[in-house]
A protein has these predicted regions:
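Pseudouridine synthases involved in rRNA/tRNA modification
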Residues: 1-36, 81, 200-207, 212-223, ...
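RNA pseudouridine synthases
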Residues: 1-181, 185, 290-294
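Short Pro/Gly-enriched beta-strand edge/turn motifs at strand-loop
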Residues: 42, 65-66, 190-194, 207, ...
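Short, surface-exposed secondary-structure edge patches
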Residues: 50-54, 225, 262
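Short small-residue beta-strand/loop micro-motif enriched in glycine and branched aliphatics
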Residues: 99-102, 194, 221-222
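Glycine-anchored helix-breaking recognition loops at helix->coil/strand junctions
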Residues: 128-132, 196-198, 254-256
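Short loop segments at secondary-structure junctions
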Residues: 147-149, 174-177, 191, 215-217, ...
């Protein structure tokens, strides 16, 4: 996907090199190399610029990201998309349950990647699929997809620095504590390719905070709001099971389908800095009816 970005140089940036300025704005070495190989990739006041040139006040730096390739081996499939937000750099999807984020064995034409390949293909726009905060197949809610390499790199770095703040909602079995921090390392379970467990010897550092929003004594279920301080695979599901309040409907960790047919987990809020504009993004998705109806 193609993107043109303009930067007006102010007094604070005077004297910096073009490369130094762009690196401060999140351009990696890989992106800069690609721009150097692109016609009109980096312009200074409308003229081809070398990255070692020094900037002057009121210079106009224009970057042209050109991506004509598409993701390999992802078939475009016309699937419903609930778009929570979209601009030239990112798209945020409110993902339904029973939709994997990525193709895998047995899931070649029913994923979010397939849906987005069709969505952009129908607009004659080349598209490389870059999912930033991947959700499990049956987890609903907000997930960010970058539309070009610059946005993907900046947001990927934000994930590594824990600068994307994620709020989840879950329905758990039992009456949870009013609030709690769970700090317990997570590792892959022996003899399993997908299941995780708390393991204080082999596990990776993992921290989850939660507060209980509601409790229904009629069905002995709690609605909790959770904040991830780390991003381990199945972190919420494993942590809540570990403290004795597993998510209902979870086929791996608590296959109790009395009240719901899928794991009761929803990505309800994302707060992050926009990768290009620097704007603070605060996106919210309502708790779905299959969870809300239990309270």
């Amino acid at each position: 996907m193609n993107r043109k970005i303009d930067y007006k140089i102010n007094e604070n940036d005077t004297g910096k090199t073009v490369e130094g300025f762009l690196k401060e704005h999140g351009y990696t070495h890989q992106v800069l190399v690609r721009l150097k190989q692109t016609d009109h990739g980096i312009l200074r006041n409308g003229v081809w610029a070398y990255t070692n040139e020094r900037l002057c006040k009121d210079d106009l730096i224009t970057v042209q990201i050109v991506e004509n390739e598409c993701s390999d081996n992802i078939a475009p499939v016309n699937l419903p998309l609930d778009i929570a937000y979209e601009d030239d750099d990112i798209i945020v999807i409110n993902k339904p349950f029973d939709m994997p984020a990525h193709p895998s064995a047995g899931n070649h034409d029913n994923t979010l990647a397939n849906a987005l390949m069709y969505y952009y293909g129908s607009q004659n726009k080349p598209f490389v699929y870059r999912c930033i905060n991947r959700l499990d197949r049956d987890t609903t809610g907000l997930t960010i997809v970058a539309k070009h390499t610059l946005a993907g790199g900046i947001l990927g770095n934000a994930v590594a620095k824990r600068a994307i703040h994620r709020t989840y909602y879950a329905v758990c079995s039992g009456c949870t504590p009013t609030c709690m921090r769970i700090s317990a390392p997570i590792a892959r379970k022996d003899a399993s390719t997908i299941e995780r467990c708390v393991d204080f010897k082999r596990g990776e550092y993992a921290v989850t905070d939660f507060i209980r929003i509601r409790y229904n004594p009629d069905n002995n279920l709690s609605l909790v709001k959770l904040r991830l301080l780390t991003g381990r695979t199945h972190q919420i599901r494993v942590h809540m099971k570990y403290i004795g309040f597993p998510l209902i409907g979870d086929f791996l960790y608590n296959p109790d389908y009395t009240y719901i047919s899928r794991q009761a987990l929803h990505s309800g809020r994302l707060v992050f800095t926009h990768p290009v504009t620097g704007q603070k993004m605060n996106l919210i998705s309502d708790i779905p009816s299959d969870m809300k109806s239990l309270f």
